[in-house]
Regions:
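Non-catalytic substrate/cofactor recognition surfaces at enzyme active-site rims
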Residues: 1-127
Length: 127
């Protein structure tokens, strides 16, 4: 059994109100509650439970599953663990004007690949 928890470095938050209009980071912080941003991992045998501080898109798990299988691990990624930093979706959807990708994606583009990379690296660390 092993456990890991670490803070995730993130960009400054913003909220998009139109395609080229964003609420400044200092205003975002004034109108929202601060939330911890960390990833946690619990490994029991060959099962790894990964906790994320976001609404983590299921579309991102294929690459994580592939890495876990190569390491002979089964993995379960969960959302809303310990904090909330908005939606983390596939990077290609960042500019899509939908609720999850436009309104609730608070930390800019490329977080899908960023989170997948962090989780894949965590899986390597625990094997």
């Amino acid at each position: 059994t092993s456990t890991i928890q670490f803070d995730i470095p993130l960009r400054k938050p913003h909220m998009r109100v139109a395609t080229n209009w964003r609420v400044r980071p200092w205003i975002f912080k004034k109108i929202t509650d601060a939330s911890p941003a960390y990833i946690s991992l619990l490994r029991i045998g060959n099962i790894a439970f990964i906790g994320t501080p976001c609404d983590f898109s299921g579309e991102l798990t294929a690459a994580i599953d592939e890495r876990a299988n190569a390491l002979d691990l089964d993995v379960l990624v969960t959302s809303f663990n310990g904090g909330y930093i908005g939606y983390i979706t596939k990077d290609e959807w960042y500019n899509l004007k939908e609720y999850e990708t436009f309104v609730m994606n608070w930390y800019g583009p490329y977080n899908g690949a960023y989170f997948v990379g962090l989780i894949q690296r965590l899986l390597e660390v625990i094997t």
